[in-house]
Amino acid sequence: MFDFVMSEEEIRIRDEVRSFVRNEVSSEYLQMLDRDEVDFPIEVYRKLAEKNLLGVRFPKEYGGRGSTWVAECAAVEEIGVLGSAIGCVYAMPSIVGEAIYMFGTEEQKKKYLVPMLKGKLVSAEALTEPRGGGGSDFFGTTTTARKEGEYYIL
């Protein structure tokens, strides 16, 4: 991302993430990921959380830094150097967190968003289900929910 469009704070966050990429994730670890010797890079996820680098655009009251989308995008760009596995893990609290932040109750934000940004809760999303020609038509996705006891089966 170009420095001339970024504020000092956004540059500082980008540089923090860049430093994390260079100093906290070894090439040996990345090779282990490539060889499928790591099921989920939880160690990296927790280190990012310890450094308050997850969901930097969310308000501080929920564990973010109260920064901007520009800072978030710059951080994602830097993390992307580590490959898609870690990039997806990094982006998930932001993607899932956005739905909780925008549409969740205060109770849900405290129950899910805060622990996500602290690295104590791992989030995920499902884009498609088997149907027709498959693919990843995010806006065309349909879902059914069936109640079984106290739970819903999606």
Region annotations inferred by a language model:
Residues 64-65, 107-154:
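Glycine-rich, Trp-frequent "lid" loop and neighboring beta-strands that shape
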Residues 50-122:
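Internal helix-loop-helix
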Residues 1-14:
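Intrinsic disorder at enzyme termini
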Residues 33-34, 60, 126-129:
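Short coil/turn segments at secondary-structure boundaries
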Residues 11, 15, 35-42, 65, ...:
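An alpha-helix initiation/capping motif
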Residues 16-24, 43-51:
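N-terminal glycine-rich anion-binding loops that anchor highly charged ligand groups
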Residues 26-36:
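C-terminal helix-coil-helix/basic helical segment that borders enzyme active sites and/or dimer interfaces
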